[in-house]
Amino acid sequence: WDYTAVQDMTLADMVVDGEPKKVIMQAPKNGFYYVIDRSNGDLLRAHPYVQTNWASHVDMETGRPVENKEMDYSKRAQWILPGPLGGHDWQAMSFDESKGIVYIPAQDFPFLYSLDAEFKATGLYKRNPGTFNLGLDLKNSTFLATEYADEALTAKGYLKAFDPLTGEELWNVDHVHYWNSGVVATAGGLVFQGDGLGYLSAYNTDNGEKLWTYNTYISMLAPPITYEIDGEQYVVILAGTGGPENFVGYTNDTAAYKYGNFGKLLGFKLDSKVVLEAPDVLDKTLPEQ
């Protein structure tokens, strides 16, 4: 599956089932949001936070996801959610302890899983440099994707406000592209996120309403941060993208595709007079032969 659990973890004090708990929380790739008592390791909650079809739920006794037998790809190819990029990847989420709500840079990125013929015959899988090594039939992935096109699921990214105790989605903001930046929530009721198209935006944490946006002309992956110096509040982001976009190529609606992936450190404050000028669009026309 390639469902790593290296995504950021959040420490918090929460009241769970009427009792105060010191918890550790994570939204790993596999699509389930885990709340764990960090004093003893007890699993307290494990709700799906994105579309998840590879498993039905997490067994609260064992802590293991219960696989969906209908999505077994050993006999036929299956479109799986989440795919190997996960429902949440490197991009940092943010927790508002006063509300008990987490803001997740989530994504639905389906992937067509089919076992490699040699692997099925021998149980061995030869490493393929420069690509995913999941034991899958990637050599025939284009053919398989065409064959199973009528079953394909749509990739999308979104900012989600999620209650980790109830599993309820309070709101979500759909993005044009699936690969967007991490987020930061503030005590003033704002959550900031950059997107693949190059826009850094501020949303109302209560309802997801977009309150401010700025075109940076740079696709973003890292989370914004905020801090105060001499009474002035700043929002700063290391703008630039990476991960699968660098791996498989930039898609044509992203800022990285249009202008290039030139990383910059961008800082914002109220009443700033600095204006970021639009860069030239890259010329991608093929030279005449």
Protein language model features and the residues they cover:
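Beta-sheet-rich non-transmembrane sensory/scaffold domains
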Residues: 1-289
